[in-house]
Amino acid sequence: MDLNTLKPALGSVKQGKRIGRGPGSGHGKTATKGHKGQKARSGGSIKAGFEGGQMPLQRRLPKRGFTPLSRVEYAIVNLKQLDAFEANSSVDTESLVAMGLVKSTACAVKILGNGDLAKSLRVSASKFSQSAKDKILAAGGTVEETV
C-alpha cells in the first residue's frame, strides 16, 4: 500500500455540483438560479432579516431588559460530589479543577447542599448555600468564603 494508491471509501465522497457547464450537466443555462428576478442577478443577495420593505420582525418587537455588566457566573458543586475527597483534606478551586468538578480556576465556585457529607473537610469557595454550610460544619469541617 502506497500513499498514491489510497482512495476514499465508495460512496463517502459526493461529487460537487458543477453549475453553468452546458445542457448535458443538468445545471447549465440558468445555473440553478431560475428565471430572472433579484436572486438570479449577480450580487443579488438579500440582507438577512429583509422583508421586502415591510418593517422587519427584529424592529417590530420591543427591546426588553438589559444585561448587567457585573454579573458573576458560578460553577455549581454539590456536597455529594465533595464526598469523593479524602477525610480532613483541603477543598479549594485548584483541587476541584484537578478532580474535574470545575472547568477552570478562573470561575467562581458555589457549594450547594444537595447530598450528605460524612467526612470532615476544609472547604474554601466563593459562596455557600446555608444548608451546605450547616452540613459541612455538622460533619466537623470548616467553611471559608473567598472573595
Swiss-Prot record:
Which keywords describe this protein according to UniProt? Ribonucleoprotein, Ribosomal protein, RNA-binding, rRNA-binding
Q: Does the keyword Ribosomal protein apply?
A: yes
Checking InterPro entries in the record gives: Ribosomal_uL15, Ribosomal_uL15/eL18, Ribosomal_uL15/eL18_sf, Ribosomal_uL15_bac-type, Ribosomal_uL15_CS
Identify the PROSITE patterns for this entry. RIBOSOMAL_L15
Asked if the Swiss-Prot or TrEMBL record annotates the protein with the keyword Lyase, the reply is no
Molecular function terms from GO: rRNA binding; structural constituent of ribosome
Where does the record place the region Disordered? 1-62
Write out the biased-composition intervals (Basic residues).
Answer: 30-39
- Report TM segments: none
Cross-referenced Pfam families: Ribosomal_L27A
Family of this protein: Belongs to the universal ribosomal protein uL15 family.
Q: How does it assemble?
A: Part of the 50S ribosomal subunit.
Official protein name in the record: Large ribosomal subunit protein uL15
Q: Which organism is it from?
A: Pelobacter propionicus (strain DSM 2379 / NBRC 103807 / OttBd1)
The organism's taxonomic lineage, starting at the top: Bacteria, Pseudomonadati, Thermodesulfobacteriota, Desulfuromonadia, Desulfuromonadales
